């Protein structure tokens, strides 16, 4: 998400410091220590300004939600929402998704949300798409077997590509829809989703059941090199 730089970013970040995890790698394998009574650990990749994040945490007080966002200008808005709602079960981290396995232990996550990621439409950038099989490999290592990935996008070509990737990895896909809100609002919407739904743009959604699968070593190596470049 691209946003204008905020002149008062640092003071605002400081006021929300209780919601930010500065060294997430230190919690690898022990994220539940942040909320010992939680029944599940959910992770949202790319939370943006946090509408979905805050409302999901509020609706599921027994769940620990970790929200990932690389744009600090967006993250601070999301953290302020959590603070203003006095939420106790959500925390935020700045993390490159390519480093998932450095932050979360195998099978530590119960559910992963991928909402409206960058579609990277050019074919040469396909490996940057968050539903590329190399990323799916990382998700299925950190999400427990039988856990789920919930994926939403307004981009039809990305959704079609993603379904092909899920199938190529042998992953079960369920509750597939190409027009989620056709008969009325379903579930919690992101801010981005609200805007596009209001314009009549169909929202694609599906759920993927995680399980281990084998990714060719050469493909995994190439993708990791691409992310580091």
Predicted feature residues:
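Class I SAM-dependent methyltransferase "Motif I" SAM/SAH-binding loop
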Residues: 46-48
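A short glycine-rich, Lys/Arg-flanked "PGG" loop and its adjoining helix->strand segment in the class I
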Residues: 131-145
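Conserved SAM/SAH-binding beta-strand->alpha-helix loop
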Residues: 71
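Conserved beta-strand signature within the Rossmann-like core of class I S-adenosyl-L-methionine
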Residues: 146-153
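Short alpha-helix immediately C-terminal to the canonical SAM-binding loop
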Residues: 75-76, 159
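Class I S-adenosyl-L-methionine
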Residues: 162-164, 169-229
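S-adenosyl-L-methionine
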Residues: 1-41, 51-58, 80-106
